[in-house]
């Protein structure tokens, strides 16, 4: 038995999503998703721009969709069935919320008569994600009222555009009652009236800065690339740029590794700026913000979400894009001050232990390689030693900074790149999202998964709890004793174990099709000792 009303309204929902810029869908199959999933599969055959991925693990699916949205900078839909399945999207929705990514959750639901009376696979899904999804709507696709279809067309476009404009996730809840089968190969013509939203650009008076010792701090950036405009401004006005590894602006013309420079006491009074103009999100290096506070350096924050400053040290916030800000900024910086900062990049960077992997990647990666970096030590090491010798696309989940979902997000990212991608991760992070590797196998994604295997959580060895010798290994070190060769075997991917980072270049030069797992082993205690020796070496240079 088929439902004509359900068929028509489902088509309108999918067409309205497409009219709003949605082209990529990640589906976690379940009984209640039946009408949406089937109509979507049919729509994919009819429209070459529609791409559908199937991920049977909802937690992985949420992050896979996030990876596509993060890389493409466009909304992506994840579709799931009712009950606890939908709750598995929560971690990805949380990351999308804080990272300002327009992730759209289509949550199929049980109808009203099955709510709150013990029906199986049923829970309250109305605004299930709470404040994490500022935008929410519930559509009754089986309602025959003539205004309902127009409502679906309008509200879908309105809310998707709102989610895109603000960089926020959206939940569309779909209560469905049986029969769930749509009418396939339906000839009903769907016509969507496009809803156009025009952004207004506010022009303000030129921003004149009288200070002559100004530094720009380019933080993590999930929005449009402004690297060319930033570097041109830096050259024209002699303003040094500290570029975070996730700023999309790091090159050999920008300052890198500031965390280690501060730690080694390189930034003496002659480097002290009168003003720091900060773009983007919170820098990977916490030490940079601590330095600004300690030195009481005035900070202006420029971002579409300016004012989100946990350091509470920002003195002036501009809610605008960096590009718009730079076009209105007038200043004359001190040339000697600029040159002094630029010379910081001449200081030798000694990469030891686990950081040697990031250093080697900096030397060997081809232009425009997409690299996803796990949190904890991997992203910190990358921020410290990756100079931006060539233009790379570096990504990470630095919204909530969790280690879950990293594999799936990286795999979503890899679907966008035309060349092989890289995931740099630790063994603990890989374990957290091992299910995600099924997508690499299923779609034969071209990605090299480089696992820094220190048998546990390396970052805790740098923290005070490492002194609690009696309890540390069980409570924080958490050795997993995973055999990575068996992980690779489980997902039918080539496996290579390297003795050190030096062999990475030759390894990556051997091209393969599909995913590949590369393991490099390190000892956690030796890694800590190496970092301490390196700090002493830097302090004496």
Curated annotation (Swiss-Prot):
| EC main group | transferase
Q: Which reaction does it catalyse?
A: isochorismate + 2-oxoglutarate + H(+) = 5-enolpyruvoyl-6-hydroxy-2-succinyl-cyclohex-3-ene-1-carboxylate + CO2
| Keywords for this protein | Magnesium, Manganese, Menaquinone biosynthesis, Metal-binding, Thiamine pyrophosphate, Transferase
Cofactor annotation remark: Binds 1 thiamine pyrophosphate per subunit.
Which SUPFAM superfamilies does the entry link to?
A: Thiamin diphosphate-binding fold (THDP-binding)
Record's protein name: 2-succinyl-5-enolpyruvyl-6-hydroxy-3-cyclohexene-1-carboxylate synthase
Give a short account of what the protein does.
Catalyzes the thiamine diphosphate-dependent decarboxylation of 2-oxoglutarate and the subsequent addition of the resulting succinic semialdehyde-thiamine pyrophosphate anion to isochorismate to yield 2-succinyl-5-enolpyruvyl-6-hydroxy-3-cyclohexene-1-carboxylate (SEPHCHC).
**Cofactor dependency:** Mg(2+); Mn(2+); thiamine diphosphate
- Family membership, please give it: Belongs to the TPP enzyme family. MenD subfamily.
Q: Which InterPro entries match?
A: MenaQ_synth_MenD, MenD_middle, THDP-binding, Thiamin_PyroP_enz_TPP-bd_dom, TPP_enzyme_TPP-bd
Q: In which pathway does it act?
A: Quinol/quinone metabolism; 1,4-dihydroxy-2-naphthoate biosynthesis; 1,4-dihydroxy-2-naphthoate from chorismate: step 2/7; Quinol/quinone metabolism; menaquinone biosynthesis
UniProt subunit comment: Homodimer.
Q: Its Enzyme Commission number?
A: 2.2.1.9
Example GO biological process: menaquinone biosynthetic process
GO MF terms here are: 2-succinyl-5-enolpyruvyl-6-hydroxy-3-cyclohexene-1-carboxylic-acid synthase activity; magnesium ion binding; manganese ion binding; thiamine pyrophosphate binding
Q: Which organism is it from?
A: Leuconostoc citreum (strain KM20)
């Amino acid at each position: 038995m088929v439902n004509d009303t359900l068929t028509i309204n489902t088509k309108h929902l999918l067409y309205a999503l497409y009219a709003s810029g949605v082209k990529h869908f990640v589906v976690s199959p379940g009984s209640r998703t039946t009408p949406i999933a089937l109509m979507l599969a049919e729509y994919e055959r009819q429209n070459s721009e529609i791409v559908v991925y199937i991920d049977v693990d909802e937690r992985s699916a949420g992050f896979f969709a996030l990876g596509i949205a993060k890389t493409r900078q466009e909304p992506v839909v994840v579709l799931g069935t009712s009950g606890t399945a939908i709750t598995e999207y929560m971690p990805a929705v949380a990351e999308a919320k804080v990272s300002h990514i327009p992730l759209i959750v289509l949550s199929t639901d049980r109808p009203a008569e099955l709510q709150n009376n013990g029906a199986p696979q049923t829970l309250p899904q109305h605004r299930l994600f709470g404040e994490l999804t500022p935008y929410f709507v519930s559509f009754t696709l089986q309602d025959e009222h003539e205004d309902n279809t127009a409502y679906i067309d309008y509200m879908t476009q309105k809310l998707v555009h709102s989610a895109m404009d603000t960089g926020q996730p959206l939940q569309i809840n779909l209560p469905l009652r049986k029969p769930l089968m749509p009418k396939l190969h339906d000839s009903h013509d769907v016509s969507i009236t496009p809803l156009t939203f025009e952004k207004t650009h506010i022009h303000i008076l030129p921003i004149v800065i009288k200070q002559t010792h100004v530094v720009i701090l380019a933080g993590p950036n999930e929005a449009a690339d402004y690297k060319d405009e930033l570097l041109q401004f830096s050259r024209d006005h002699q303003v040094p740029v500290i570029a975070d590894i996730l700023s999309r602006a790091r090159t050999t013309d920008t300052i890198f590794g500031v965390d280690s420079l501060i730690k080694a006491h390189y930034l003496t009074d002659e480097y002290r700026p009168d003003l720091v103009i900060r773009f983007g999100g919170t820098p990977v290096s916490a030490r940079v913000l601590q330095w600004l506070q300690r030195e009481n350096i005035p900070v202006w924050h420029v971002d579409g979400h300016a004012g989100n400053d946990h350091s509470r040290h920002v003195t002036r916030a501009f809610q605008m894009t960096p590009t718009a800000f730079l076009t209105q900024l007038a200043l004359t910086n001190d040339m000697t001050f600029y040159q002094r900062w630029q010379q910081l990049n001449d200081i030798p960077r000694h990469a030891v232990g686990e950081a040697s992997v990031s250093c080697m990647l900096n030397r060997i990666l081809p232009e425009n390689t997409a690299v996803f970096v796990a949190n904890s030590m991997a992203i910190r090491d990358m921020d410290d030693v990756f100079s931006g010798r060539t233009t790379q696309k570096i990504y990470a989940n630095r919204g909530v900074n969790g280690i879950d979902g990293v594999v799936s997000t990286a795999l979503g990212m890899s679907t966008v790149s035309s060349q092989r991608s890289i995931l740099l991760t630790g063994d603990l992070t890989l374990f957290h999202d091992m299910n995600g590797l099924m997508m690499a196998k299923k779609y034969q994604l071209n990605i090299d998964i480089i696992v820094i295997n220190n048998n546990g959580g390396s970052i805790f060895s740098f923290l005070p709890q490492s002194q609690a010798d009696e309890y540390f290994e069980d409570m924080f070190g958490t050795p997993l004793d995973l055999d990575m060769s068996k992980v690779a075997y489980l997902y039918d991917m080539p496996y290579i174990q390297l003795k050190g980072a030096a062999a990475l270049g030759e390894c990556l030069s051997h091209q393969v099709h599909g995913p590949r797992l590369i393991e490099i082993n390190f000892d956690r205690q030796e890694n800590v000792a190496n970092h301490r020796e390196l700090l002493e070496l830097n302090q004496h240079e």
